[in-house]
Amino acid sequence: MRYLDNVNQSITERRDIVIETAFKLFAENRIEPVTMTVVADNCNMGVASIYRYFGTKKELVIAVATKKWREYYGELQRHYNELNVEKMTAAQELEFYIDRYIDLYKENSDLLNFNANFSIYIASEDTTKDEMKPYNSIIDKFVNKFHILYKKAQDDKTVRTDISEKSIFYNVMYAMLSALSKYSSGIIHSADQDRNYEKEICQLKDMYFEYYCRK
């Protein structure tokens, strides 16, 4: 039994090495140009080993996204508990989530860069719902968090509920994430070398609050 445990642990550790290595490569170079052979070389493994752990590149890409957003959700939940967000108003809770996204821009640009390219890559592949199930199960956790916020808003009236829950979630969370990804990757055109992206991001946050939160 101990032998089997050690074997399984070794497989898990090797999979994690592949995922972490692939994540860095995908974030730095985009997903499409990075081959499984390149991943294998950077892991100091044979490409056959990579394919044993992940049958296709698409499977690896989804595994990377799932692991990284699972880790981020864990960090989000830790901050949620530490700040006692459950006791906040809906507007304060919305600000909490937006601020955590802004923290991604400041502290984890690799995840933003990977995520921007992930959406493009998945859209270009023939991806089934079953293949996306592990990833979607993590994203559903974020959706459920926002559902709790929206229910709170129905009681305390600090966030508008004349706009549907889904509309606010997509307009705020997804649009904010998309904007942060563009700022992080530097693809927003600017002729001004001294342009203050963080100031612009805070202005974007203020715009959301002006529209969605009650005065």
Give the label of every model feature segment.
Residues 1-2, 100-103, 144, 148-156, ...:
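C-terminal peripheral helix-coil segments that are non-catalytic and often amphipathic
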Residues 63, 78-108, 165-172, 198:
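Hydrophobic alpha-helical connector segments
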Residues 35, 112-116, 161-162, 188, ...:
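Short, hydrophobic secondary-structure boundary micro-motifs
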Residues 2, 6, 17, 25-63, ...:
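Helix-turn-helix
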Residues 92, 137-139, 155-173:
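All-alpha amphipathic helical-bundle segments outside canonical DNA-binding/catalytic cores
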Residues 11, 61, 65, 69, ...:
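Amphipathic, non-transmembrane alpha-helical scaffold segments
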Residues 21-25, 175:
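Short amphipathic alpha-helical elements of helix-turn-helix/winged-helix folds
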Residues 103-145, 167:
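Short secondary-structure transition hinges
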